[in-house]
Amino acid sequence: MGEILLESYKVQYGYDKWSIIRPANIFGEYDDFSGNGTVISSTIKKIYEATHSIEAWGDGSPIRDFVYAGDVADAILKLYTDKIHTTINFGAGEEITIKQMIETLIKISKKPISINWDSSKPNGDLRRQMDITKQTQIGLLPVLGFEKALEITYDYYINKLL
């Protein structure tokens, strides 16, 4: 809806000094770790609280493009400071399964935890991947790799929130 309003404003008043950024699945330090937040923040909480295993919905095969919140903030700042007025998708450009994400978090936690897949629960969309061609052409590339960003987020949770 916001994009349509901005386009209408452009047509009516000729003003096009705005940018729209459509981020992929964002995660990072200031996420909602209550268990009702994103899949990553909820998984971090589950792993931290687990002693032997965690339950995960579906079979772990859905693919996501996870992007670190700090990289999204940097992209917004670059669009603003470089006066780039456009609409872009912003993602890491890396296809990661839910299973890979959970296994990476377990590795980071250094806890001997197994995953119990509950196939009676839904997988969700099988693939959510953005076309980041325009983002790449502008030179807006995420700085942190997925695993490093997960480490920062996990460390924040255990060292700052608990």
Question: Locations of the language-model features?
Answer:
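Structured catalytic cores of enzymes that bind and process phosphorylated ligands/cofactors
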Residues: 1-5, 28-32, 122
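Active-site Tyr-X1-5-Lys
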Residues: 1-22, 44-51
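Flexible, glycine-rich beta-alpha linker
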Residues: 16, 21-40, 63
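C-terminal substrate-binding subdomain of Rossmann-fold SDR/epimerase-dehydratase oxidoreductases
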Residues: 49-162
